[in-house]
Design a protein with these regions (language model features):
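Cysteine-centric segments in proteins
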Residues: 23-130
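C-terminal segment of classical bacterial N-terminal signal peptides
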Residues: 13-21
């Protein structure tokens, strides 16, 4: 009689723990030019990176800032500004640590936007100075 409840509980737990980071409630501060869909896509990419590099994909909060056109990118994977785009710096509280990312965004020829994510720092304790 208890077996169905145990199985149902196990299934519910597996479903909850397998949700991507972007499906969870995330606190956003700062400014971004990203649409809600692009913001979600970027967060999914960062969550994949966090999972691969640290074994955890939970993103609690994100602070976003648009960088000036004079910004010199760190190891750019794409020349966003020459493609009509821009750079942003996102600071995430992910998995109990802070990490900063350079986000390049530019218009896509297929419609919408393309982007590239470059880690600027490793994982740092939340109490560490920026």
């Amino acid at each position: 009689m208890k077996l169905p409840y145990v199985l149902a509980g196990a299934l519910a737990l597996a479903t909850l723990t397998s949700q991507p980071a972007a499906a969870q409630k995330i606190s956003f501060t700062g400014y971004t030019k990203a649409s809600p869909q692009l913001r979600l896509d970027v967060l999914r990419r960062i969550a994949q990176y966090s999972k691969a590099s640290g074994g955890c994909a939970f993103v609690f909060s994100a602070h976003m800032e648009i960088l000036p056109r004079s910004y010199v990118p760190v190891q750019p994977s794409m020349p966003a500004t020459s493609r009509g785009g821009h750079f942003e710096r996102w600071t995430l509280n992910a998995c109990g640590a802070r990490q900063r990312f350079q986000i390049a965004m530019w218009p896509s020829r297929r419609g919408g936007s393309d982007f590239a994510v470059t880690p600027l720092t490793g994982r740092r304790p939340l109490h560490a100075r920026r």
